[in-house]
């Protein structure tokens, strides 16, 4: 069997094969030409007019240094502003990145989900994953940069400078993708979506980081926090200090996101994502309701209820149903429910793959009364573990050339992605009995047993979150 990293690239290249066939004898156009270096950029890189000075560096301040709290309102406004003057090319570039991150997201979600038990759930961010790997690409030189580009799904080996991925374009497009997700609700919308990303760069004392690299991260993570601390003497204490620091700065209850660090690490790269959505037209039901984890175990959780014209599809052949609920004018929540709870893994394997969005075209509008749990999902995963499972354990290992991050011989430890996903009603608590609105009879859809979810931004086609909900208030 081919290594998983290669199969991902092969799948993307198969999807793009039509581009080469259509081109015939014409001048070669890179399938992701909006994301690679232009000829003029290459001329500047290969023949600089003046000698390039070395990148300025700095030493991160100690972790105990007082830090300002994250202002999520300001982060929201910053993302909205980033989408106000988008040109057609910006949107096309975002769509290209959306295609790439979806492919990688499905691939790595499958890898990650194989480590979960049947009763466990989790939430996964393809955007955070792709952003993290792109950040390392920006900080890498060959051969590491070429290996990362191939893993990101962009062909380029042996094709010259104009086939090399421009990491800054990709990071800018990732900011566009995040902005499109939150901008659709508008400033006055009750059901406004919040999306905040914070990166912590934790280094051994005395290690110098290059300023251009750290500044480049601001595209997808407006707040980047470089901090130094002793990582070697007591790795467990170092992990506790990092968790406490991030909790105090963000106010997000991520749990024990980081459990330990490798004592020989000199750099940890941790990305923290907080999503908060409110379901327009939904209300919180009185009291707690039963959610069945399996056939014999239930937990009591808050439930939401709402009636509207939603898109729906029941696939009797594969024993699953899909309900699509708008979170904003351009963002959808997709809820995938197995007809039989024991089939959840089978439905998950069938649904979360590269033809997912094509299959979603089978949905059609109808009146639905939807009841589902309020969600507070937490998950943390180490990209180093995922890379090892994808047969690429050395990609960010000791031999990786990350000279654009630091001139020091970096030893990258854990590369953490942590997600806090919250979904609530936008209305007040509903009365015990809610009269059905006039119109066609509403189909009753109740999610009171394990199901899958996805959050899709329509303009870019990017899937921001994929998840399995087995315990609605705890998915660590």
UniProtKB/Swiss-Prot annotation:
Q: Which UniProt keywords apply?
A: Disulfide bond, Glycoprotein, Secreted, Signal, Vasoactive, Vasoconstrictor
Record-annotated membrane-spanning stretches: none
- One Pfam family name is Serpin
Q: What pairs make up the disulfide bonds?
A: 42-161
- Organism's domain of life? Eukaryota
Q: Where in the cell is it found?
A: Secreted
Cleaved signal peptide residues: 1-24
> What InterPro entries does the annotation carry?
Angiotensinogen, Serpin_CS, Serpin_dom, Serpin_fam, Serpin_sf, Serpin_sf_1, Serpin_sf_2
Q: How is it modified after translation?
A: In response to low blood pressure, the enzyme renin/REN cleaves angiotensinogen to produce angiotensin-1. Angiotensin-1 is a substrate of ACE (angiotensin converting enzyme) that removes a dipeptide to yield the physiologically active peptide angiotensin-2. Angiotensin-1 and angiotensin-2 can be further processed to generate angiotensin-3, angiotensin-4. Angiotensin 1-9 is cleaved from angiotensin-1 by ACE2 and can be further processed by ACE to produce angiotensin 1-7, angiotensin 1-5 and angiotensin 1-4.
Q: What is its main location?
A: secreted
An MF annotation (GO) of this entry: serine-type endopeptidase inhibitor activity
Gene3D superfamilies xref list: Alpha-1-antitrypsin, domain 1, Antithrombin, subunit I, domain 2
Q: What GO CC terms are in its UniProt record? A: extracellular space
Q: What does this protein do?
A: Essential component of the renin-angiotensin system (RAS), a potent regulator of blood pressure, body fluid and electrolyte homeostasis.
Q: What is this protein called?
A: Angiotensinogen
Please give the organism: Bos taurus
In the record, what lineage is assigned to the organism producing the protein?
A: Eukaryota, Metazoa, Chordata, Craniata, Vertebrata
């Amino acid at each position: 069997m081919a290594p998983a990293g290669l199969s991902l690239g092969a799948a993307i290249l198969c999807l793009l094969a039509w581009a080469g066939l259509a081109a015939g004898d014409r001048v070669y156009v890179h399938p992701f030409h909006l994301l690679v270096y232009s000829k003029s950029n290459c001329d500047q890189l290969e023949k600089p007019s003046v000698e390039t000075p070395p990148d300025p560096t700095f030493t991160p301040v100690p972790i105990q240094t007082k830090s300002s709290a994250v202002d999520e309102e300001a982060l929201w406004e910053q993302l909205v502003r980033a989408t106000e003057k988008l040109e057609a090319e910006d949107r096309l570039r975002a769509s290209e990145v959306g295609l790439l991150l979806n492919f990688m997201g499905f691939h790595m979600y499958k890898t990650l989900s194989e480590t979960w038990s049947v009763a466990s759930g989790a939430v996964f961010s393809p955007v955070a994953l792709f952003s993290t790997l792109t950040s390392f690409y920006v900080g890498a030189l060959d051969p590491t940069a070429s290996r990362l580009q191939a893993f990101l799904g962009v062909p380029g080996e042996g094709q010259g400078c104009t086939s090399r991925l421009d990491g800054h374009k990709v990071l800018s497009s990732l900011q566009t993708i995040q902005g499109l997700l939150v901008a659709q609700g508008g400033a006055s919308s009750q059901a406004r979506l919040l999306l905040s990303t914070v990166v912590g760069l934790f280094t051994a004392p005395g290690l110098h980081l290059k300023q251009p690299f750290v500044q480049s991260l601001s595209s997808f993570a407006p707040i980047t926090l470089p901090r130094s601390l002793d990582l070697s003497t007591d790795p467990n204490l170092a992990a506790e200090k990092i968790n406490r620091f991030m909790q105090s700065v963000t106010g997000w209850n991520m749990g024990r996101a980081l459990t330990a660090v490798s004592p020989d690490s000199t750099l940890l790269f941790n990305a923290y994502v907080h999503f908060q959505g409110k379901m327009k037209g939904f209300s919180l039901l009185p009291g707690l309701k039963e959610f069945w984890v399996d056939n014999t175990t239930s937990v009591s959780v808050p439930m939401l209820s709402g009636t509207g014209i939603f898109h729906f599809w029941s696939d009797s052949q594969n024993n699953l149903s899909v309900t699509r609920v708008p979170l904003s004018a351009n963002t959808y929540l997709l809820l995938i429910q197995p007809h039989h709870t024991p089939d959840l893994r089978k439905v998950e394997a069938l649904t979360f793959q590269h033809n997912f969005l094509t299959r979603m075209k089978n949905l059609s509008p109808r009146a639905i009364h939807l009841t589902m749990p309020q969600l507070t999902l937490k998950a943390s995963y180490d990209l180093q573990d995922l890379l090892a499972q994808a047969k690429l354990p050395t990609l960010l290992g000791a031999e990786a050339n990350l000279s654009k991050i630091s001139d020091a011989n970096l030893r990258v430890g854990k590369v953490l992605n942590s997600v806090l996903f919250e979904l609530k009603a936008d209305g007040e608590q509903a009365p015990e009995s809610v009269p059905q609105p006039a119109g066609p009879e509403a189909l009753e859809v109740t999610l009171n047993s394990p199901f899958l979810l996805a959050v899709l931004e329509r303009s870019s086609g990017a899937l921001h979150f994929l998840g399995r909900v087995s315990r609605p208030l705890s998915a660590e």
